[in-house]
């Protein structure tokens, strides 16, 4: 898996880490991060493609042939994206969440569950969208409650969860006030306890705090109604 990462062959890396996960033992922190990086890159490529193709599809209105080609290609990418998300969610439900012992592992995997349901909801419609949105919110909320009671406000996993949960509120639920409130609370609580940061996680934590602040600036700016690429990070 490490070799695949160095070669940037993320599909191979994901397949390796899926096989490791299916052995059924609790993953080490390093294995957990390799799994996360692999699937984040695999699904990220499809999410980017889907956005580009959807934009092209909208621009080809009035040109039936080109629009049909764009729609068929979008549906192909959509199926790939859905299959990847379902793979990850299956691993989370069957192995990762049930086997997670430390609170930080439980939060990490529940956050991941929220993320992959969120990715599904981006391409879903109708009842399917409602279900994926509800599942995403439920996973994020459960992770959020554990993180508040069991982890320091400066912990990079807790901060990463707050970042992605706030993006969920902004992009998926269209609730800018809730998104800003959540991001601001996470940032302010971390700032107050900055002196508790250990050297090991200082870089990760401060990077996510910067992303939280960037999103807050973007969301509260005068241009908040305009389409903008929201900064989003996973840890």
Swiss-Prot record:
GO terms for cellular component: cytoplasm. Adapter protein implicated in the regulation of a large spectrum of both general and specialized signaling pathways. Binds to a large number of partners, usually by recognition of a phosphoserine or phosphothreonine motif. Binding generally results in the modulation of the activity of the binding partner. Belongs to the 14-3-3 family. Coiled coil: none annotated. InterPro entries: 14-3-3, 14-3-3_CS, 14-3-3_dom_sf, 14-3-3_domain. Gene3D superfamilies: 14-3-3 domain. GO terms for biological process: protein localization; signal transduction. It comes from the Eukaryota. This is 14-3-3-like protein. It holds the Pfam family 14-3-3.
């Amino acid at each position: 898996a490490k070799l695949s990462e160095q070669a940037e062959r993320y599909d191979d890396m994901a397949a390796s880490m899926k096989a490791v996960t299916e052995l059924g033992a609790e993953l080490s922190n390093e294995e957990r991060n390799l799994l996360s990086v692999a699937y984040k890159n695999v699904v990220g490529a499809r999410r980017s493609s889907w956005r580009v193709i959807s934009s092209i599809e909208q621009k080809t209105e009035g040109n039936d042939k080109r629009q049909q080609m764009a729609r068929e290609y979008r549906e192909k990418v959509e199926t790939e994206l859905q299959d990847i998300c379902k793979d990850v969610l299956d691993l989370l439900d069957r192995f990762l969440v049930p086997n997670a012992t430390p609170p930080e592992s439980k939060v990490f995997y529940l956050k991941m569950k929220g993320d992959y349901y969120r990715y599904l909801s981006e391409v879903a419609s109708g009842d399917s969208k409602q279900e994926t949105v509800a599942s995403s919110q439920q996973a994020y909320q459960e992770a959020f409650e554990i993180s508040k009671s069991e982890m320091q406000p400066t912990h990079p996993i807790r901060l990463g969860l707050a970042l992605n949960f706030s993006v969920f509120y902004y992009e998926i639920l269209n609730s800018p006030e809730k998104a800003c409130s959540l991001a601001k609370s996470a940032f302010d609580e971390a700032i107050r306890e900055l002196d508790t940061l250990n050297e090991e996680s200082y870089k990760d934590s401060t990077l996510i705090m910067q992303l939280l602040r960037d999103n807050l600036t973007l969301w509260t700016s005068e241009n908040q109604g305009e389409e903008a690429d929201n900064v989003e990070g996973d840890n």
